[in-house]
Amino acid sequence: MMGKKSRAVPGRRPILQLSPPGPRSSTPGRDPDPDPDPEADSTAAATSQSAPAAATAAAATSPAVPASAAPEDSPSEDEQEVVVEVPNVVQNPPTPVMTTRPTAVKATGGLCLLGAYADSDDDESDVSEKTAQSKEANGNQATDIDSTLANFLAEIDAITAPQPAAPVVASAPPPTPPRPEPKEAATPALSPTASNGSDTAQTPGWHYDTQCSLAGVEIEMGDWQEVWDENTGCYYYWNTQTNEVTWELPQYLATQVQGLQHYQPSSVTGTEAAFVVNTDMYTKERTTAASSSKSGPVITKREVKKEVNEGIQALSNSEEERKGVAAALLAPLLPEGVKEEEERWRRKVICKEADPVSETKETSTASEETGPSIKPPEVMMDGTEDPSQEELCSVVQSGESEEEEEEEEQDTLELELALERKKAELRALEEGDGSVSGSSPRSDISQPASQDGVRRIMSKRGKWKMFVRATSPESTSRSSSKTGRDSPENGETAIGAEDSEKIDEISDKETEVEESSEKIKVQLAPKVEEEQDLKFQIGELANTLTSKFEFLGINRQSISNFHMLLLQTETRIADWREGALNGNYLKRKLQDAAEQLKQYEINATPKGWSCHWDRDHRRYFYVNEQSGESQWEFPDGEEEEESQTKEVRDESLPKLTVKDKTCTDPNSTESSENPTGSLCKESFSGQVSSSLMPLTPFWTLLQSNVPVLQPPLPLEMPPPPPPPPESPPPPPPPPPPPPPLEDGEIQEVEMEDEGSEEPPAPGTEEDTPLKPSTQTTAVTSQSLVDSTASSPPSNKAVKRKAPEMSTSVVQRSATIGSSPVLYSQSAIAAGHQAVGMAHQAVGMAHQAVSASHAAAAGVGHQARGMSLQSNYLGLAAAPALMSYAECSVPIGVTTPSLQPAQARGTMAAPAVVEPPPPPPPPPTPTPPPPPPAPKVPPPEKTRKGKKDKAKKSKTKMPSLVKKWQSIQRELDEEDNSSSSEEDRESTAQKRIEEWKQQQLVSGLAERNANFEALPEDWRARLKRRKMAPST
């Protein structure tokens, strides 16, 4: 059930909740409480009413409504009343539930509902069957609520003999899920035991509706990928390793789903199952926990809340991570028709259920005692809104019908009070715990709960609050805690643990508040309804979008968490500017993002160094904690490591940088930049990666950029679905097998816009305009390459790489210019940046060295410096470039060629004649002060150096560079010549000029007579020459 539920929760979360409750309560519902179920069953058995309800519920889990009714039925008269009540409630859910029930197998609420509704239409003909009735209830839902109620009652009666009803339900479901429905039928038939059994025999007893996506569920997909089959409207599962495809939920996933369901069922079931189910569930729980003691329910509530919260968060994480918030919201949504029907039905049911509610409330009361639990369903939804959202839907839908109105008010009040408390608590937690570590998970809940939108939404509807939460980047942080993602249960437990703690505290308070709020709840019902309508619409839209994205292979897995963070930040900022986002919420989220980046920075920075951000130069600088020395370049704790990481960072950062530009938030920019860096770093070097590793869960997620860590992207088209077993629909045509794309993202690391040019050390930076830097860079790399010639080994390497570099450098400079490279650029780099080209060419400390040389010393020295640099490059540059490309080449090589010290600027004599010694690093590692530019010649000098360098490079230009330049010229030429204004003469003249320039640049001019100055007596000589031949 949990799995189902989880799925259901993520999938149809809010919308389907309605129907899922029934089904959930039915197979999933009971399953969710499989643990409680047995207890509940036993306990329920003990508690005659509870027991029968539980048993019935368990038995008729599928017919959750009936189950609910059954519980009351068991009580006997309550049974009927309750049944009626249940029907109402159930009707709420029942209609969906009925459908869901048959579809109950599809533990995915909304999706199930969709399937169920479809089924209901199909099954409407089967209305005669009670299962059909339940489905009919669906059909009737649209058609006639009364008839649906009658059907429900009949079904409930049948359920009273639960087994028959369950089987019937089972028969009905088959149409919807492509997978064998019989199992589902069997599960309902199994009765309580079945629910438990179904849990146990997940695939067989417990049936997961393949129409429901696992996307929102916090489960570890492992080698399995969920593939949507348009023909059947169901998901099939594809094992990317074995290429196995199955319509059934693979055992690996089923176990997780069930596990999740265990967590959520209680809350989800309670909430979703229209408090009838809640009643059953809660009854069971209550019975289990305290038979009917409120403390028991409270406990249950807490448990539920925790579970739900955990589950929800896990779900929401996985959901958000896998599908995204939209998907999470969407999944629960039913098709519009269904949604509308549900709404109509819900409204009617709500009116009718007002009475049943009182009856149901008897059960519900216990439930309500647990009520807080049930209300908590809303509250829980609040706290656990992720599942809650679904649950809220169901609660709102079913709960609205019965307890919902009362509980809604109560919940609303409770929610508001609880939320306020939660807010305070969560904020405290957030600020205390949340801000640094799992703040995202907690802050997710706490923030969303406490945060503007969430809280309001929460008060109005816990669901939305959860949604907000789900939407919040927490998903990233949550997802970042891989624990949540990997094992929904673990994640739920891990993340949920924090949440659950908060939620527990909150639940306690909520419980108190809820009781007081119960009264107020009713008033909020209308609001809730409006919210529900809105939710449904949102869900619908989200579902559609999510489905489309999913089909197109667009998902979270293809981007790193930092990218997600960047996008989320940008989106939030945009929303905030529009006035649609609470400023405090935005601030909190930005702080969370900054915290995540901070963690990344901490983990990425070598020991003994601290990483700081220079706002003016928009780049990182590093301070040696012992010496207080600061530098732009990534700490040389191992120069190579530094270079590597730096470079990697540079590469990755440039991407981020570009994105960052879009990002208004400096924090977000930083964060995005850093993140990429770390990702790159990690992928590219073991050393770096180890440094990152500490963040493990979060970082691992962050590193999702790195293909290695990424599971195959959904982009890989799964193999065609297997023929659905026992499922009426013919096997869908196999979707085309997707080419595996999982690692496509990594290429980004190669960014050549790395901004190989680092911002010059503070003060020098502005000297080199970006463009000049770019050109210079190209030239420099050429000259470097040439100078490299002096050092044969490096020469080759450099030459080979230089061309790449020059191009990449140019691009990089552009990127970097706008956004300074973060990590990769070394302090020296900053210096050279002024020199820019040289350092760009190398992109490393050695570059900086050569650059500074060139700048400081003159062209001659430059040449020397360059050669030195190229040497440095030779070993380092090539690797460095490689690292850009591969992110895996350790720059260690570089170190040997040029001692880091040298690179830094101590450079040996060759390095430089004039390079000014790098300014002493600021004594204190205070982050704010940008490190003094090491060896950065004064700006003027730098410029001169650059010019000299440029000249020199002009004399020695690698052929590739020449080619590139000539091509560029030709292109420009074409552009110019294409204009009709230019006449042939001007074009010819231009070409001549260009040729001259090329000759000069390439150094061929020295040997070309056309470039020799004519002697003053050239006319006379010319005459003489002409005369000579004639004579």
Swiss-Prot record:
InterPro entries reported for this sequence: WW_dom (IPR001202), WW_dom_sf (IPR036020), WW_domain_protein (IPR053076)
Biased composition (Low complexity): 41-73, 83-92, 469-482
Cross-linked sites for Glycyl lysine isopeptide (Lys-Gly) (interchain with G-Cter in SUMO1): K305, K352, K527
Modified-residue entries (Phosphothreonine), positions: T176
Biased composition (Acidic residues): 400-414, 742-757, 971-984
Tissue: Ubiquitous. Highest levels in spleen and thymus.
Annotated keywords: Acetylation, Isopeptide bond, Phosphoprotein, Repeat, Ubl conjugation
Superkingdom: Eukaryota
Region (Disordered), start-end ranges: 1-102, 116-143, 166-205, 355-518, 629-681, 712-813, 900-994
Phosphoserine modification, residue list: 19, 120, 125, 128, 435, 440, 443, 446, 450, 472, 507, 516, 977-979
Record-listed cross-link Glycyl lysine isopeptide (Lys-Gly) (interchain with G-Cter in SUMO2), residues: K339, K352, K527
Modified residues (N6-acetyllysine): K294
Pfam families hit by this protein: WW (PF00397)
Start-end of Basic and acidic residues biased regions: 418-430, 499-518, 643-663, 985-994
Induction: Up-regulated by p53.
CDD domains, per database record: WW
WW domain mapped to chain residues: 218-252, 603-637
Biased composition (Polar residues): 134-143, 190-203, 436-450, 664-677, 771-794
Residue ranges, compositional bias (Basic residues): 457-466, 943-955
Record text about domains: These WW domains interact with Arg/Gly-rich-flanked Pro-rich domains found in several WW domain-binding proteins (WBPs). The N-terminal WW domain has the greater ligand-binding ability.
Oligomeric form and interacting partners: Binds FMN1. Interacts with the Arg/Gly-rich-flanked Pro-rich regions of KHDRBS1/SAM68. Arginine methylation in these regions has no effect on this binding.
Protein name from the UniProt record: Formin-binding protein 4
Lineage: Eukaryota, Metazoa, Chordata, Craniata, Vertebrata
Record gene name: Fnbp4
